[in-house]
């Protein structure tokens, strides 16, 4: 049977910045040859708010409320790295109780982050049910945050240089344990609903494969890196906070496709529950903030009756000075390595505040993954990367 050959010009398609599966204001200029993706150019910057410049015109205490807006699905990680950098630069110690409370909050945030990835990713694939289920569990996490910090999703403003803003309220620990006991069977329910569904597996298995070498060369981090066979987790590598006190495993896969990234994130939620339970069981007493962290640099030492005498308060002063020096601090957020490069100049303001977001680096590999794929795979591969545009654009 004779076939009629049809040759068409490549079609340029704009996806976003208001497409529901763009996960924010991301615009993709996709060049298509029929159903095949020839090229893809991400256009970013629609959510740029000058967060680095704002940081350089604020003290650390003033800047903490701003940082939840980078990755607004996981604001606690932003706060953690914002206070970790000045702490490392000035050598401010964090009390054991404060460190345990931080770990509990960060792991709750990791679960909330993965849930907010899980629902929309499955909605992109075509499974609507889990999208509504995950809101139920995230609501419980937000209730815990509201009780401890006074706020729910973003702008918790809970982390402080040298500790946390307030101790855990009475009864909070019991509520958190109740959530942990409730949540583990829920993950099993999700897995039963989704993981072995033949339609779901055909949709994501073998799609968007990243080799081990590619993952390292592109500078990927977090689940994107661990799904490609690299067992790298900053909680184990950098030994920050008190993660060494707990028994938990780094979750990783070798396939490097969308299914591997899904599997890593689902397992990480179980590990987070394991860490939270251990942290609550071993929660030490003592202060929740460093009462000796009076100022990062006391400035001029003067006589007690002199005009410029600096009174020493119990908490970190809003006008403390950053010591001269530079530091790179990083934490393992739900999306990967979130880092701050900080240069202090013996001033109340940092001289340079460089944010290294995980999803900005992870997003770079998207055009490489999309070339040669079908147009239906675009939203699947993008969804598996887990990007939040507030963090990408800053």
UniProtKB/Swiss-Prot annotation:
GO BP term (any one): photosynthesis, light reaction
Function, in words: NDH-1 shuttles electrons from an unknown electron donor, via FMN and iron-sulfur (Fe-S) centers, to quinones in the respiratory and/or the photosynthetic chain. The immediate electron acceptor for the enzyme in this species is believed to be plastoquinone. Couples the redox reaction to proton translocation, and thus conserves the redox energy in a proton gradient. Cyanobacterial NDH-1 also plays a role in inorganic carbon-concentration.
Name of the top EC class for this enzyme: translocase
Annotated GO MF terms: NAD binding; oxidoreductase activity, acting on NAD(P)H, quinone or similar compound as acceptor; quinone binding
Stated name of the protein: NAD(P)H-quinone oxidoreductase subunit H
Keyword Disulfide bond in annotation: no
Subunit details: NDH-1 can be composed of about 15 different subunits; different subcomplexes with different compositions have been identified which probably have different functions.
UniProt similarity note: Belongs to the complex I 49 kDa subunit family.
UniProtKB keywords: Membrane, NAD, NADP, Plastoquinone, Quinone, Thylakoid, Translocase, Transport
Catalytic activity line of the entry: a plastoquinone + NADH + (n+1) H(+)(in) = a plastoquinol + NAD(+) + n H(+)(out); a plastoquinone + NADPH + (n+1) H(+)(in) = a plastoquinol + NADP(+) + n H(+)(out)
UniProt-annotated location(s): Cellular thylakoid membrane
Enzyme Commission number(s) from the entry: 7.1.1.-
Chief location category: membrane
């Amino acid at each position: 049977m004779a076939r009629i050959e049809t040759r068409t010009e490549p079609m340029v398609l704009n996806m976003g910045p208001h497409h529901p599966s763009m996960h924010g204001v991301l615009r993709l200029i996709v060049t298509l040859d029929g159903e095949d993706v020839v090229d893809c150019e991400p256009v970013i910057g629609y959510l740029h708010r000058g967060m680095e410049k704002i940081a350089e015109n604020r003290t650390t205490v003033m800047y903490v409320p701003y940082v939840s807006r980078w990755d607004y699905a996981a604001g606690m990680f932003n706060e953690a790295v914002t206070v970790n950098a000045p702490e490392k630069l000035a050598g401010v110690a964090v009390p054991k109780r404060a460190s345990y409370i931080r770990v509990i909050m960060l792991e709750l945030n990791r679960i909330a982050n993965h849930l907010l990835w899980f629902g929309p990713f499955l909605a992109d694939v075509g499974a609507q049910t889990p999208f509504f289920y995950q809101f139920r569990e995230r609501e419980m996490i937000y209730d815990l945050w509201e009780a401890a910090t006074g706020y729910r999703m973003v702008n918790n403003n809970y982390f402080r240089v040298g500790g946390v803003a307030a101790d855990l309220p009475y009864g909070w620990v019991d509520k958190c344990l109740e959530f942990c006991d409730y949540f583990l069977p829920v993950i099993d329910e999700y897995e039963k609903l989704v993981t072995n569904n033949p339609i779901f597996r055909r949709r994501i298995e073998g799609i968007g494969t990243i080799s081990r070498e590619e993952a390292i060369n592109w500078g990927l981090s977090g689940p994107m890196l661990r799904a490609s066979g690299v067992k790298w987790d900053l909680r184990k590598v950098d030994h920050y906070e008190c993660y060494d006190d707990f028994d938990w495993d780094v979750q990783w896969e070798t396939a490097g496709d969308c299914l591997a990234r899904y599997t890593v994130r689902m397992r990480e939620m179980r590990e987070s529950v394991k860490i939270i339970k251990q942290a609550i069981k071993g929660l030490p007493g003592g202060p929740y903030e460093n009462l000796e962290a009076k100022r990062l640099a006391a400035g001029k030492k003067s006589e007690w009756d002199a005009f410029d005498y600096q009174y020493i308060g119990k908490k970190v002063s809003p006008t403390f000075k950053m010591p001269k020096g530079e530091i790179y601090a990083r934490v393992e957020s739900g999306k990967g390595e979130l880092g701050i490069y900080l240069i202090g100049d013996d001033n109340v303001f940092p001289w340079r505040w460089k944010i290294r977001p995980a999803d900005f680096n992870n997003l770079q590999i998207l055009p490489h993954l999309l070339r040669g794929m079908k147009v239906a795979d675009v939203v699947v591969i993008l969804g598996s990367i887990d990007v939040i545009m507030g963090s990408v654009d800053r």
